[in-house]
Amino acid sequence: MKTRFAALAVALLVSAPVLAQSTAEPPDPILEAGKINARLAIEYMKREQLQAAQEKIDKALLQNPRDLSVQLAAGVVFERLQDTKRAEKHFRQALRTDAKSPEAQNALGAFLCRHGDHKKGEEMFLKAAANPVYRTPEVSYTNAGVCARSAGALERAEKYLRQALAVKSVYPETFVQLAGVMHDRGNHLQARAFIERFLATAPATADVLLLGHQIEMALKDRAAATALSERLRKEFPGSVQLRVLDDLERRNTG
C-alpha cells in the first residue's frame, strides 16, 4: 500500500475558515484576492491544469505573501510541479508565518518524509501532536507512524500509531496503517483484526481490500482471501490495486 499522510494541506486549503469581521473595517481586497487565487491554484492542480495552477499561485504570492494558507498552497503546488526547492521554501515560510500552526507543522513534516528526511519529518509531526491548540493530534501521530514505516522503522511506527489510538480509539486511517505495520512485522492475526476494525467503521477502499487479501493469504485462509479479492474486483474494477492483485495471482499460479 502506498505511503500516504492523513489530513494535509490540500484539504485544509480548499475549506479554509472564514473569520467574522469584528468591526466596520472591510477586508483588504488585494489580500482577499490572494487567498482566493491560492484556493483556485489548488483546484486547478487537482484537475491536472498545472499551468493555470502555477499562474494562480504566482498571483496569490504577489497579492498576499504573508498569509499562511497562501504559503501552504504554494508548497503544495510547487511540489506537484516537481520544484522541490521552491516547495520546501514555501512550506518553511508557512511555518515562519505562524510558528505554532499545526497545519504548517504537518505539511512540512509530510514534505520532509516524502523526500527522505524521516527524522526531521517525524519531529515535525510530534510537534504538531503536542501542540495545545491542535484539536486532532491523532492525525499527527498517525502521520508520524506513516513516516517511520516508510523509513523501515516498524517498531517506532507501531508506537506512534498506538499513541494515535490512545488519543482517539476509532480512527480508520490509524487502523489501516497499523494493519500494514503488523503485516510487515509478521503479526498477521493482529493485522487482520485492524482490517476488520477499519471495515467496521469506514467504507472499503481498494488499498484496504488488497492489503486484507495479502494478510489472509499470509494466514493461509484462502476463503477469506477470495472474499476480499472478489470485493476488489466488484467494487474497484479499474483500479491499480486490482492490477496488482492479478499480477500476484498470476505469479502464484505460474
Would you name each region that the model predicts?
Residues L19-N64, L245-D246, R250-G254:
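N-terminal leader/linker segments that initiate helical-solenoid repeat arrays
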Residues A24-G34, A202-G254:
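Terminal, low-structured helical/coil segments at or just beyond the last alpha-helical repeat
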Residues P29, Q63, R96-D98, N131-V133, ...:
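Structural marker of alpha-solenoid helical repeat scaffolds
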Residues R39, L72-A73, A107, Y141-N143, ...:
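Canonical tetratricopeptide repeat
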Residues K46-R47, R80-L81, R114-H115, N131, ...:
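Register position in tetratricopeptide repeats
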Residues V70, A104, E138-S140, T174, ...:
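TPR alpha-solenoid repeat register
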